[in-house]
Amino acid sequence: MSIGIDIAAIGMVTAVGLDAPSACAAMRARLDGFQETRFLGPGGQWLIGAPVPLPRDWIGEKRMAHLAGAAICEAFESAPEARGQTALILCLAEENRPGRPVADGARLLRHIAEIVDVEPHARSRIINHDRASGHVALEQARRMISSGEAPYVMIAGVDSYLTPLAI
């Protein structure tokens, strides 16, 4: 019999909301955040995408770190007891995908830890299984909690298709 896991807190940063309550309300209202991007398509027309409106114009890994970091900070606000004792499972795009915005997952993990202002947990890890990453992460989180490897596990996913190589 496998042990159950509880969701203690959530955080979200999306094209329609920079926190979970805003993003969920926008999605319930069927907002999607799609608009013209700064990328030109083959016909010379602006491509449509759903960029996240961050306060600064960060790009690449720095942008990914701030997207994930903001969602993680939001989750820690709801569960402050987890701060400093949470293993992070970071879900990223598969390593061979053209335009993947993250070149070095371990470096991204460290950058996120700096933004969140916590030491990286020894059991933190990266999963690169594309759309299946969330399912893989849930199973790994369940195992980590049931074995006592970590009292808390946070699963975060960050990605973008709005990169020159992806387009």
Language-model-detected regions and their locations in the chain:
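Acyl-CoA/ACP chain-elongation machinery
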Residues: 151-153, 157-167
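Active-site histidine-anchored catalytic micro-motif
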Residues: 135-138, 152-153
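Conserved "HGTGT" condensation-loop signature of ketosynthase/thiolase-family condensing enzymes
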Residues: 1-132, 136, 143-147, 158, ...
